[in-house]
């Protein structure tokens, strides 16, 4: 099949064509998943860092500033999740990945690989933002730091509880929701709303991380490491708590069986699949 076409070879409206999903190797699927996590986290960190810097420079009213920051982050997450969730689940967050591993729905080695590519994507996204801005606008590249009066214990607790809320929502609408496709279709919006709520609540106290990768990228390029460990231990503990809560108390018992009868079946999205 040629790489480029002079004319569009088919459209979804062409009744003479049938789109079939071709089986692919596990290695190719896993590679696509890792690349999806890499590029998704890259875009998230780039947009989050840029929007935070823009709000801090352009908006003097603190309420408007926080609203702008949390809305941009929430909508950015929702848009990216909608675009690539069919490939990797679009976790974009080591805390979410740890939560998925804790539930048993994701393998440990898969989770480690996801986290590595998320962190590399965060580094590239923060580096791109640093390269995009004049030195005057760089500052700390929106690295997350504790506010005055917020000690280590409070910062850890705030990040842990709020991230557990975010991961709780992710697991509920995207991981443990096997039976209602209507909820799956709006899952990115629900996750985006959880990000808006979490960032809006935490912004004043901890900078609103909820995501170790989001804090890691800007910290590297701005050399902002003061109590950085909070933004790893807090969210990851929150992810573990949410994962255990779903696994022990809220999950249904499911049974995995072989697909019966036919070689072809109709997929969730209505396209014929082999």
Swiss-Prot record:
Residues 1-33, 88-105, 176-185, 251-274 are cytoplasmic. Pfam families: MIP. A motif (NPA 2) lies at residues 211-213. It is found in: Cell membrane. It is a multi-pass membrane protein. Keywords: Cell membrane, Membrane, Repeat, Transmembrane, Transmembrane helix, Transport. GO terms for biological process: water transport. It comes from the Eukaryota. The chain crosses the membrane at residues 34-54, 67-87, 106-126, 155-175, 186-206, 230-250. Residues 55-66, 127-154, 207-229 are extracellular. One of its GO terms (molecular function) is water channel activity. Aquaporins contain two tandem repeats each containing three membrane-spanning domains and a pore-forming loop with the signature motif Asn-Pro-Ala (NPA). Belongs to the MIP/aquaporin (TC 1.A.8) family. This is Aquaporin C.
